Amino acid sequence: MSNNPIGFFDSGIGGVTLWKEVHSILPYENKIYLADSINSPYGDKSDKELDEISFKNSEFLLEKGCKLIIVACNTATTKCIEKLRRRFDVPFIGIEPAIKPAALNTKTGKVGVLATEGTLGSDLFHKTSNKHASSVRSEEHTSE
């Protein structure tokens, strides 16, 4: 197994929870976390801006030798993950829109989603919602 690190990026520190979970499963793996607070929040960025930010963050992590990049941000995942996978020759893992686990686990048939406008307006969010939450009532609000 390669000693190269696993890279993470997010628009801030929200993805630290994900980093901790990965660390608990893979404690001996080297990891690099990029908290991109300069460009935060990502939710109000145009698709072009978000692509540029995600490409730049990925290039930074690749320069550090990362063997895998985890996009620890819903907005960047929903808007950019497929473009990142096509552009770079390393695996990318993204964050699945949270409506899926919420819809699968609701006891009341209702779910609430608090996300950026970018996430709520993305094709991936709508596909996931249509596939997994069509039988529940969802209340969606932006966090911005």
Specify the residue positions occupied by each region the protein language model found.
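Non-catalytic structural scaffold of enzyme domains
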Residues: 1-143
